[in-house]
Design a protein with these regions (language model features):
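Non-catalytic cap/lid and distal C-terminal segments of serine-dependent acyl enzymes
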Residues: 13-208
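Bacterial Sec-dependent N-terminal signal peptides
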Residues: 1-16
Length: 208
């Protein structure tokens, strides 16, 4: 119980970036997935007078500040992007950190259409493997199509209306690692007219 209090306190804190600023949208509502926090990183000197590319990143809890993550590790996205921009290696971008659904992470990140093509025996095997890994208690059924609908039909339009973005494909990217890499790959396959690129690091190819 005490551990849960500590964890809840940590994840509730807003990350402190090395550069730029972070806007948090608390419990962003969706008709497709459960409500979740969205941590939006704005680069140093962000202004409404110019347009920015947007990078949508999975597992948004761990992107910016290692001091408040459960394992005291982070991607240090704000630090890395600021360094790359200063070297003129990339253009400035807004980062949208999408918190995972915690207990629903595997359900939301597992590519749905490939799973639906499996035989009943293969689906039983996937369920058994996930149950052994304590990633599901019931028969496994992905909901990644709904997750991507949330991303494309609800979150992206909100970001494009609330911030100064280039909304076109050439300036819209998605990224993640492990299962986050898998859903990012699925995102660009399902919505090639929305995303111009995907970063799929250490992709969890088996999905179990």
């Amino acid at each position: 119980f005490f551990f849960l209090i500590i964890v809840n306190h940590l994840v509730a804190q807003i990350p402190i970036p090395v550069a730029g600023k972070i806007d948090r949208i608390e419990n962003f509502k969706s008709k497709f997935v459960t409500a979740r926090n969205i941590d939006i990183w704005l680069p140093e000197g962000y202004t409404k007078n110019k347009k920015y590319a947007v990078l949508y990143m999975q597992d948004g809890q761990g992107l910016y500040d290692a001091n408040i993550t459960w394992n005291h590790q982070s991607w240090e996205v704000d630090d890395v992007l600021t360094s790359l921009v200063n070297k003129n290696s990339i253009k400035e971008a807004i980062v949208v950190g999408i918190w995972n659904g915690q207990t629903s992470r595997h359900v939301e990140y597992f590519p749905q259409k490939p799973y639906d093509c499996l035989t009943p025996i293969e689906k039983d095997t996937v369920t058994a493997q996930l149950q052994r890994a304590s990633r599901t208690k019931d028969f496994f059924q992905p909901k990644s199509d709904k997750y991507l609908q949330f991303l494309v039909k609800e979150l992206k339009p909100f970001i494009d209306s609330a911030y100064s973005t280039h909304p076109n494909k050439a300036n819209t990217f998605v990224a993640g690692s492990s299962m986050g890499g898998l859903i990012s790959m699925y995102a660009i396959c399902e919505y090639p007219n929305v995303f111009g690129g995907a970063i799929c690091m250490s992709t969890h190819w088996p999905g179990t």
